A protein has these predicted regions:
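Substrate-binding/active-site clefts of carbohydrate-active enzymes
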Residues: 1-97, 101-102, 122-133
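Structural recognition of the beta-strand scaffold that forms the well-ordered cores
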Residues: 106-110
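Acidic-and-aromatic substrate-binding clefts and catalytic sites of carbohydrate-active enzymes
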Residues: 112-119
Length: 133
């Protein structure tokens, strides 16, 4: 995988994360919002670009026989709440699903300064709504 863009393309995709590996951005050095922490892959939560389902999730969900269901639920939720399919909105939806389905009442984040405030706001909104259901 080290240098193979074709192999890395089967992972999240360059619209989803920055990772500094073949086919992915390394981010902007010196900016905590756009630079991977300690070389670890980083979701591009600041991005307003509409994304598709990542290759890794497509493969996983198809193998499990639940691709259509997962995509339909995600798109339905985002659409009915007026959200675009962005990295932040997808990740926030998945985290809020844990709140809705399992009663999770908190998340730990060791690198909060690396996530933009709008993404924290969106996560808060979605999780607060999930608590009401």
């Amino acid at each position: 995988y080290q240098g193979s863009a074709a192999m890395w393309a089967k992972w999240w995709g360059a619209d989803w994360i920055r990772a500094g590996v073949s086919g992915y951005s390394a981010g902007q050095g010196g900016n905590p919002m756009t630079e991977p922490v300690a070389g670890l892959p980083d979701f591009m939560t600041e991005s307003t670009t509409t994304v598709g389902i990542s290759a890794i999730l497509e493969t996983k969900w198809k193998r499990e026989g639940r691709y259509d269901q997962e995509v339909a639920e995600l798109k339905s939720y985002l659409s009915s709440n007026g959200y675009d399919m962005t990295v932040t909105n997808c990740v926030s939806y998945w985290l809020s699903t844990w709140v809705r389905d399992y009663g999770v009442d908190g998340f730990r984040c060791d690198t909060a300064k690396h996530v933009d405030k709008q993404s924290w706001k969106r996560l808060n909104e979605m999780c607060t709504d999930a608590l009401k259901t």
